[in-house]
């Protein structure tokens, strides 16, 4: 990658970081309207979480899924690249196994094969280089570990396009307007075998829930 492309990618990521910094204090209240969607994601995940698991969550926001699911596992490392989002999450009471920290999903500090599962919810589509995050997820997952990657996708109705336009007008950069087949192909190209997927949400904000495992027979995007 040229220095110019690297600089552009970092600039775009900074733009979205500034967006989340601005919205951190009111993000939790705003997400109350999305409670049914978070509940649906949690319902899909729960059968695959067990008490001995160590889980990494990327792009946790202020903990919408962290608090709900962390009680089901031994250790839950919830991370976000927005310091203000993490500060908001830390204001809430939490169990001993739930930890919050500021981390960059494309450059994680953890050793190889550390986690039994990784969750990244509603984030890959707003990353300028989501393949880097996917490569890091692949690296830190234990053999046989699981990736949970619910992500907003691009629907086929005009309302979806209006939603994305509204988000861009608010200052959030959307880099990948995947349809469901394109999103699943992206995960597969990154070295993951998709085990199941489901379309959640509504026609305004369709979300593709995907559960995948590392496919060690394939070459990942690095």
Model-derived regions: residue spans:
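A short SAM/SAH-binding and catalytic strip from SAM-dependent methyltransferases
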Residues: 117-129
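Class I SAM-dependent methyltransferase SAM/SAH-binding core
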Residues: 56-107
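A short acidic, Gly/Pro-enriched loop at the edge of an enzyme's catalytic core
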Residues: 106-117
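Conserved class I S-adenosyl-L-methionine
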Residues: 2-50, 64, 68, 88, 148-170, ...
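Short alpha-helix
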Residues: 175-190
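Core SAM-dependent methyltransferase catalytic element
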Residues: 190-192, 196-222
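A short glycine-rich, Lys/Arg-flanked "PGG" loop and its adjoining helix->strand segment in the class I
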Residues: 131-143
């Amino acid at each position: 990658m040229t220095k110019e492309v690297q600089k552009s990618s970092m600039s775009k990521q900074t733009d979205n970081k500034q967006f989340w910094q601005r919205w951190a204090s009111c993000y939790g209240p705003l997400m109350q309207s999305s409670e049914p969607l978070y509940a649906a994601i949690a319902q899909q995940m729960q059968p695959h979480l067990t008490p001995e698991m160590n889980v990494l969550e990327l792009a946790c926001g202020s903990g919408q899924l962290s608090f709900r699911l962390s009680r089901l596992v031994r250790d839950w490392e919830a991370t976000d690249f927005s310091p203000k989002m993490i500060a908001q999450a830390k204001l809430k009471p939490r169990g001993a196994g739930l930890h919050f920290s500021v981390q960059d999903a494309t450059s994680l500090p953890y050793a190889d094969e550390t986690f039994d599962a990784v969750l990244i919810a509603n984030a890959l589509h707003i990353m300028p280089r989501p393949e880097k995050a996917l490569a890091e997820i692949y690296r830190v997952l234990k053999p046989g570990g699981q990736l949970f990657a619910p992500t907003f996708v691009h629907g086929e109705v005009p309302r979806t396009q209006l939603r994305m336009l509204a988000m861009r007008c608010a200052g959030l950069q959307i880099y990948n307007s995947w349809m469901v087949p394109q999103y699943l192909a992206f995960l597969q190209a990154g070295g993951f075998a998709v085990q199941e997927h489901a379309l959640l949400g509504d026609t305004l904000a369709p979300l593709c829930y995907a559960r995948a495992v590392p496919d060690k027979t394939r070459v990942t995007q690095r």
